[in-house]
Amino acid sequence: MKQFSILIAGGGSTFTPGIILMLLDNLDKFPIRQIKMFDNDAERQAKIGEACAILLKEKAPQIKFSYSTNPEEAFTDIDFVMAHIRVGKYPMRELDEKIPLRHGVVGQETCGPGGIAYGMRSIGGVIGLIDYMEKYSPNAWMLNYSNPAAIVAEATRRLRPNSKVLNICDMPIGIEVRMAEILGLESRKDMDIMYYGLNHFGWWKSVRDKQGNDLMPKLREHVSQYGYVVPKGDNQHTEASWNDTFAKAKDVLALDPTTLPNTYLKYYLFPDYVVEHSNKEYTRANEVMDGREKFVFGECEKVVKNQSSEGCALHIDEHASYIVDLARAIAFNTKEKMLLIVENNGAIVNFDSTAMVEIPCIVGSNGPEPLVVGRIPQFQKGMMEQQVTVEKLTVEAWIEGSYQKLWQAITMSKTVPSAKVAKDILDDLIEANKEYWPVLK
């Protein structure tokens, strides 16, 4: 079996050790000869990289390992780029969340004005990675799971339409893991699903078992009472903010009980509730900086200090196994059915053909073949048209350096009550993002 060379772009991410451990756990299915890391923050990456070097030496000494801030070094001789970058890191995420909240609007990483701000920072970073990949390893594929995936995917469609980039998100996978637990199934792969929408903005229209039996009634019954909170599940290890999001799905479901919703729809359908239950001084970004950031860097420090991973609490990122499934589908033409963010092109019959939609695809060595979804109901279509307009205007604003279009994008967001509030938020975001955004005129 061929052995592959992997580059993790965003090597300094706190998700990197979990992803590397997950890759090592799947070597029988996806053999690896080399793992590289790339980041533009040398100091941050070195802390993670030194610990990962020890993990690899212990668990898979045959795999060549390196990390670099030099694009040529990092991107040469690569088969797959796994991209998870956060331009501006968590201090900028904190502003994405707190600036809208100051104006009484949802402050969230990928939804509403915060997601638009993050998108404006991310476009240049992701396009840069694609260009490095195409220059130094022109046959490589990029598996991009950088947020905000919807805006990033639209930017890749507009700016690098022929690139070998697959945009994927783990949120539906996380919810499907919960669905499988609710149903008492071994794995989410025991379900056959049909899902449609935009990224962080979609609905399951059917869930069946492998024998074709309809599982929707049982799921709907559970979600209508408990949301996606799992009975006897590992809920105590889920942060409070996530538990609330999973529970709130029951109210989102009530709007259309024929489908099952993505949890992120709460930000668009219940923005008043979200703002009311937000702490304007301590947001999700603070939770992450005080939690996962300190934990992962602390554990990496211990590994380096002891020159051993013994007693180390870093664990495999199980959810991230979808990245291996995707890489295997390309490498070995497995024809696996996966949710990807792809150009609609008629898959959703009554929706913009150029929209980047999140739908099931059959993935093989030539990339994804989207499955036909058919027609979608007016309610979902209307919501998606409003949201895809936000995403398209944001990308146009970045390309054209247009203040007008970004103001329109924020105004169009279902989370924002008026054009005046949109303008006030935009002006504050411009001030905060001077280092990262193009100049808007």
UniProtKB/Swiss-Prot annotation:
The active site is at residues 170, 264. Pfam families: Glyco_hydro_4 (PF02056), Glyco_hydro_4C (PF11975). Its cofactor is NAD(+); Mn(2+); Fe(2+); Co(2+). SUPFAM superfamilies: LDH C-terminal domain-like, NAD(P)-binding Rossmann-fold domains. Divalent metal ion. Manganese, iron, cobalt and nickel ions enhance activity whereas magnesium, zinc, calcium and strontium do not. GO terms for molecular function: maltose-6'-phosphate glucosidase activity; metal ion binding; oxidoreductase activity, acting on the CH-OH group of donors, NAD or NADP as acceptor. InterPro entries: GlycHydrolase_4_CS, Glyco_hydro_4, Glyco_hydro_4_C, Lactate_DH/Glyco_Ohase_4_C, NAD(P)-bd_dom_sf. Optimum pH is 7.0-7.5. One of its GO terms (biological process) is maltose catabolic process. NAD(+) binds at residues 4-70. Induction: By the five sucrose isomers and other alpha-glucosides (but not by sucrose or glucose). Substrate binds at residues 93, 147, 284. PANTHER family: 6-PHOSPHO-BETA-GLUCOSIDASE-RELATED, MALTOSE-6'-PHOSPHATE GLUCOSIDASE. Homotetramer. Hydrolyzes a wide variety of 6-phospho-alpha-D-glucosides including maltose-6'P, trehalose-6P and the 6'-phosphorylated derivatives of the five linkage-isomeric alpha-D-glucosyl-D-fructoses: trehalulose-6'P, turanose-6'P, maltulose-6'P, leucrose-6'P, and palatinose-6'P. However, sucrose-6P is not a substrate for MalH, and this enzyme also fails to hydrolyze beta-O-linked phosphorylated disaccharides such as cellobiose-6'P and gentobiose-6'P. This is Maltose-6'-phosphate glucosidase. It comes from Fusobacterium mortiferum.
